[in-house]
Amino acid sequence: NNCPQDWLPMNGLCYKIFDEQKAWEDAEMFCRKYKPGCHLASFHRYGESLEIAEYISDYHKGQAEVWIGLWDKKKDFSWEWTDRSCTDYLTWDKNQPDHYEGKEFCVELVSLTGYRLWNDQVCESKNAFLCQCKF
């Protein structure tokens, strides 16, 4: 694994939690600027969710929810990853996603589920966030 020391290696990619709270779009831009090819994290199987959840529980300071790279760009429940990978796996918290009040189009890991399950949230909300990079 070529990941820097405080990054989590998984399936050839590296993941890191950033505690600084940002709106979803600012978080995605931060990941992209960190290094070419970086994005907010995408998930493709349950095992990844569990490994990430454990990593975040160990390293995340504070109770903030955590942005990941999934969003409903078209606002019609057609969820897309910012790294353009296939949306082949979803693990929503109960009764989610709900586009609550027609305003929630970005996806966060829910702290009350141990960061295992997802909720759609207002994109302007300030959250911690998870970047995914290749090194």
Curated annotation (Swiss-Prot):
CDD domains: CLECT_REG-1_like (cd03594). InterPro entries: C-type_lectin-like, C-type_lectin-like/link_sf, C-type_lectin/snaclec_domain, C-type_lectin_CS, CTDL_fold. One of its GO terms (biological process) is heterophilic cell-cell adhesion via plasma membrane cell adhesion molecules. A motif (Galactose-binding) lies at residues 96-98. The keyword Acetylation does not apply. It is found in: Secreted. Ca(2+) binds at Q96, D98, E104, N119, D120. One of its GO terms (molecular function) is toxin activity. The keyword Calcium applies. GO terms for cellular component: extracellular region; protein-containing complex. Residues 10-132 form the C-type lectin domain. Keywords: Calcium, Disulfide bond, Hemagglutinin, Lectin, Metal-binding, Secreted. Disulfide bonds join C3-C14, C31-C131, C38-C133, C106-C123. Expressed by the venom gland. Homodimer; disulfide-linked. Belongs to the true venom lectin family. PANTHER family: MANNOSE, PHOSPHOLIPASE, LECTIN RECEPTOR RELATED (PTHR22803). Galactose-binding protein which recognizes specific carbohydrate structures and agglutinates a variety of animal cells by binding to cell-surface glycoproteins and glycolipids. Is a calcium-dependent lectin. Shows high hemagglutinating activity, that is inhibited by lactose, galactose and inositol. This is C-type lectin LmsL. It comes from Lachesis stenophrys (Central American bushmaster). The lineage of its organism: Eukaryota, Metazoa, Chordata, Craniata, Vertebrata.
